[in-house]
Amino acid sequence: MAALFVSLLALTSLVPVQGAATVPQTDYAKRAERVLRSAPLIDGHNDLPYAIRRSTNDQIYDGKLPFETSLKGHTDLPRMRKGRMGGQFWSVFIACPSDPNAPINTPKFATRDTLEQIDVARRLVDKYSKDLMYCDNPGCAKRAFREGKIGSFIGIEGGHQVGSSIAALRQAFYAGARYMTLTHNCDNAWATAASTVRAGKPDLGMTDFGPALIKEMNRLGMLVDLSHVSHQTMRDVLKITKAPVIFSHSSAYEVSKHLRNVPDDVLKTVAKNNGVVMVTFVSSFVKVDDPDSADVNTVVKHIFHIAEVAGWDHVGLGGDYDGTTELPKGLEDVSKYPYLIEKVLEAGATEEQARKLVGENVLRVWTEVEQIAKKIQRSGVLPVEEVWKGRNGTALSERSTFIEGPAPLEYGCD
């Protein structure tokens, strides 16, 4: 009887589990393909909408934007399909003021331009709805993958894009944005940027107004993105946020000492926070001392370092395609993702770990952020109304006299 049991056990060990026994362990390309069939590859940051703005002024219907055949940059539909992409956070980036030290209270066009970028991103998805699906929640992202479409989500890259206004942030959320990077390459009313520290200025972290922003993002269910912020800002936010954070396109500081990357103490805190660091590919970030020699294995090294320090539950992918001209050998455009996953498996990751890396982790974070927001809203917490100290409420507030009654014609709507 014992012999029979052993024989049956031996037979059951040969039964393939989800195809696992049908692919040799050393066939990394086929194993990568299996990973990408079973989990959506979700990239945290792609600047195609800004490339469209620069090349066509956001005009996509006149036949001059061949997204369905071939574009000049890093991203188009054929290459996304070749890259087995399951989801993309499209950055609706608008640059910081030309003078990063300009007074933040000076009216700017960034908020208007951000709305235009949200608009073109959503119109692009609608135009190519056979292949793309706009989603504003993780459940929809999973459904898009099941239906063979590429989930398309929206992220804002810097608080300057909403004029350092929590009310404007809310409206951007209602328009479809699901994450906001707290800063780009300029400080704002909420936080210090990494670029400020890189320029030799002090790292002041979050401002006194910063916690109000995090409170509202947590309440809304908007992902807090800590790429581009200073190291002290990272630490300050992680002390107060009630929800997991993301780094939409950052790598490991211990591997490459660029201030855009995440130091080990922060990686450990991200693990406690249940967040995710989505590794970027920018050559000067991943190999600051010799960017020209960066290759796919350089990126793999960053992935494994984050996995070793924070755990495989806290690492993802955020290439920054169409947002840089510096890309490692082997990762020249979005079609190269299967090759990256092949190299991750070859370096020793399991298929379970690879599935977490490509998309399961960021979906888990997004789901938890939504759940926490619903709990906060059910508790009766009201929208934040706070503004930063000293802000002028309107342009008229700078005038020396207050006029009662109907405004003169020059101030009116006529």
Swiss-Prot record:
Keywords: Dipeptidase, Disulfide bond, Glycoprotein, Hydrolase, Metal-binding, Metalloprotease, Protease, Signal, Zinc. Residues 1-20 form the signal peptide. InterPro entries: Metal_Hydrolase, Pept_M19. It is an enzyme of class 3 (hydrolase). It comes from the Eukaryota. Zn(2+) 1 binds at H45, D47, E157. Disulfide bonds join C96-C186. Its EC number is 3.4.13.19. Glycans are attached at N392. Hydrolyzes a wide range of dipeptides. Belongs to the metallo-dependent hydrolases superfamily. Peptidase M19 family. This is Putative dipeptidase ARB_02715. The lineage of its organism: Eukaryota, Fungi, Dikarya, Ascomycota, Pezizomycotina.
